[in-house]
C-alpha cells in the first residue's frame, strides 16, 4: 500500500549561483559523506547537486516531515545502480525511524529538463511477515 508521495522541482540556475557563492561548503551541507566523491567527479556539479537536493526534499514531503531530525540531508544519500536507476540509502537514526513508521519499499525517479531538476518519491508500507 502506498503511504506517501512526494515531488520536488529545483531551479538548477539557483543551485549554480549558490555553488558560485559558497563553493564546496554549500555542497557539503546538502550531500551525505558518501555522495561527496561522486559530486567532485561530476562533469555537471550543479545538476548533480540539484537532483540530490530535489530527491531529499521529495522524500521529506512523502514522509510529511520536512527536512528535520531524523530526516536530514546527511542522513539520506542517493546512488545509482549499474543500469542508472537511482535509489536511496539511509544513515544514522533514519533507518530506525522509517522502520518505526512501517515504511517498507521506497521508489525514486529523477529527471531534468530546461534548467529544472525534478524528483518523485513513492513510499510503500512494510508488509507484515507471516509466521
Model regions and ranges:
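Core catalytic alpha/beta fold that binds nucleotide/phospho-ligands
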Residues: 1-131
Amino acid at each position: 500500500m502506498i503511504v506517501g508521495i512526494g515531488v520536488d522541482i529545483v531551479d538548477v540556475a539557483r543551485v549554480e549561483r549558490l555553488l558560485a557563492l559558497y563553493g564546496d561548503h554549500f555542497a557539503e551541507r546538502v550531500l551525505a559523506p558518501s555522495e561527496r566523491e561522486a559530486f567532485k567527479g561530476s562533469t555537471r556539479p550543479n545538476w548533480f547537486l540539484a537532483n540530490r537536493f530535489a530527491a531529499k526534499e521529495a522524500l521529506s514531503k512523502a514522509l510529511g516531515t520536512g527536512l528535520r531530525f531524523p530526516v536530514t540531508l546527511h542522513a539520506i544519500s542517493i546512488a545509482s545502480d549499474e543500469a542508472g536507476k537511482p535509489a536511496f540509502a539511509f544513515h544514522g537514526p533514519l533507518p530506525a525511524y522509517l522502520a518505526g513508521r512501517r515504511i517498507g519499499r521506497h521508489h525514486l525517479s529523477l529527471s531534468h529538463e530546461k534548467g529544472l531538476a525534478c524528483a518523485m518519491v513513492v513510499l510503500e508500507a512494510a508488509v507484515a511477515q507471516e509466521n
